[in-house]
């Protein structure tokens, strides 16, 4: 009981700041009209729901969501789905858009995004500030991270993950640690990451999740703000500047959720986004969205149930090994190994397999589609074939990823585009 009370005190003394202002340029047209944290995932969620759910499930009830790039759909989603917390009970999920709080500039980097909200954080009087990336899919109990931070006497703790060197090169900050997990070296997105001693093919990558003692964080942010040569970034500037003279520790993600398999995905490319969605279709997926003990919360629209119609020999409405969300209608068509978001319609004689269809997609009659991502609101014309010949896909103006996934958006189809 005393340990539970100790953890509870830590989470109550913590303010979480989720950095959700990034574009996600490697997702190309998928983020032309939305920030990466607002991108859909898993049939009914958005990426931002995962760090937010981790906070709530971990007992952290004071959260700020920092927004910047094309944030309309993100702000609307968080306001609708996460606006039920009561400030008078010490609970809140607040939107913190780039509003030039401390200067005439927009957020210049991750550290600047926190610095420009320093007065808002100060009003919460937290003992600890947790800074979280808003654009990854993962499950993590932050209470364990806070406990490790407090017990180690750290001034800053960095969440880390063993990652293949070829995946980390140019993509993640890479750390060196001693036998007690104290950080003794840090490089931001090196071309040639240093390997861990036990495995020359792996390195220790930063997940972009940090815990700071509040006073220490404020001191470092003010110091960085006065440095004209700084890029205002935690990975490039703050961490390298403090590891020599301050207590900075690494927290291994493998110990993030007791009794649960580790799950973390960077869905920052078309291929990784597609693969992470496809993994959910496995009989035992690496991410269990059906775990009642660790629910993923989101905004719930009032939609009718999914419907499958027609059972004729030549047109049978059916879906196999698929996720089919509310409001979908499969009308005399076959869907196989697909993730269908809300209100998707697939019309007679069409066959869609191994694909991700975002909300409000309509596939008209006699279409054949495979290995594709169809963006929200796409209307696929009758008889169109997608994913069977990459040269033909490119000739139609579609984008084909390195691993052969075809992306189709409304603009590529000649349909009107704009904010969601």
Curated annotation (Swiss-Prot):
Role description: Involved in the biosynthesis of ADP-glucose, a building block required for the elongation reactions to produce glycogen. Catalyzes the reaction between ATP and alpha-D-glucose 1-phosphate (G1P) to produce pyrophosphate and ADP-Glc.
UniProt-listed Enzyme Commission number(s): 2.7.7.27
Enzyme class: transferase
Reaction it catalyzes: alpha-D-glucose 1-phosphate + ATP + H(+) = ADP-alpha-D-glucose + diphosphate
SUPFAM superfamilies: Nucleotide-diphospho-sugar transferases, Trimeric LpxA-like enzymes
Keywords on record: ATP-binding, Carbohydrate metabolism, Glycogen biosynthesis, Glycogen metabolism, Nucleotide-binding, Nucleotidyltransferase, Transferase
Family in the record: Belongs to the bacterial/plant glucose-1-phosphate adenylyltransferase family.
Biochemical pathway: Glycan biosynthesis; glycogen biosynthesis
Domain of life assignment: Bacteria
Residue sites binding alpha-D-glucose 1-phosphate per the record: 107, 173, 188-189, 206
HAMAP family for the chain: GlgC (MF_00624)
Protein name: Glucose-1-phosphate adenylyltransferase
InterPro entries: ADP-Glc_PPase (IPR011831), ADP_Glu_pyroP_CS (IPR005836), GlgC_bac (IPR023049), GlmU/GlgC-like_hexapep (IPR056818), NTP_transferase_dom (IPR005835), Nucleotide-diphossugar_trans (IPR029044), Trimer_LpxA-like_sf (IPR011004)
UniProt-listed GO biological process terms: glycogen biosynthetic process
Organism encoding this protein: Shewanella frigidimarina (strain NCIMB 400)
Pfam families tied to this protein: Hexapep_GlmU, NTP_transferase
């Amino acid at each position: 009981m005393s340990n539970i009370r100790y953890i509870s005190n830590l989470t109550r003394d913590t303010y979480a700041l989720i950095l959700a202002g990034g574009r996600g340029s490697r997702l190309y047209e998928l983020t032309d009209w939305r920030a990466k944290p607002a991108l859909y995932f898993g049939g009914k969620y958005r990426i931002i729901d995962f760090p937010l759910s981790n906070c709530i499930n971990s007992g952290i009830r004071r959260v700020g969501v920092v927004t910047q790039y094309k944030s309309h759909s993100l702000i609307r989603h968080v306001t609708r789905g996460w606006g039920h917390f009561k400030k008078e009970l010490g609970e809140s999920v607040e939107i913190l858009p780039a509003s030039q709080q401390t200067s005439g500039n927009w957020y210049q980097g991750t550290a600047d995004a926190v610095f420009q909200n320093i007065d808002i954080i100060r009003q919460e009087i937290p003992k600890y500030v947790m800074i979280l990336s808003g654009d990854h899919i993962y499950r993590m109990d932050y209470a364990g991270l806070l406990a490790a931070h407090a017990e180690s006497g750290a001034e800053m703790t960095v969440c880390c993950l063993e990652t293949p060197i070829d995946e980390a090169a140019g993509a993640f900050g890479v750390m060196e640690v001693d036998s007690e997990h104290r950080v003794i070296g840090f490089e931001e997105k090196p071309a040639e990451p240093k390997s861990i001693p036990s495995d020359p093919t792996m390195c220790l990558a930063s997940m972009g999740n940090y815990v700071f003692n509040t006073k220490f964080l404020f001191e470092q942010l003010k110091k960085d703000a006065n440095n004209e040569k700084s890029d205002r970034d935690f990975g490039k500037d703050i961490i390298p500047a403090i590891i020599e003279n301050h207590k900075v520790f690494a927290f291994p993600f493998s110990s993030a959720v007791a009794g649960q398999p580790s799950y973390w995905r960077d869905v920052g490319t078309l291929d990784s986004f597609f693969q992470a969605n496809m993994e959910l279709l496995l009989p035992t997926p690496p991410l269990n969205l059906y775990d009642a003990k660790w629910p993923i919360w989101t905004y719930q629209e009032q939609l009718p149930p999914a419907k499958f119609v027609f059972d004729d020999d030549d047109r049978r409405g059916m879906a196999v090994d698929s996720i089919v969300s509310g409001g979908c209608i499969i009308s005399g068509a076959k869907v196989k190994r697909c993730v269908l978001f809300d209100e998707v319609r697939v019309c007679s004689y069409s066959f869609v397999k191994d694909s991700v269809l975002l909300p409000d997609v309509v596939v008209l009659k006699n279409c054949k589609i495979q290995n594709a991502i169809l963006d929200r609101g796409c209307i696929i014309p009758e008889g169109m074939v997608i994913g069977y010949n990459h040269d033909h896909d490119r000739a139609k103006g579609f984008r084909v990823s390195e691993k052969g996934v075809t992306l189709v958006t409304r603009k590529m189809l000649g349909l009107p585009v704009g904010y969601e």
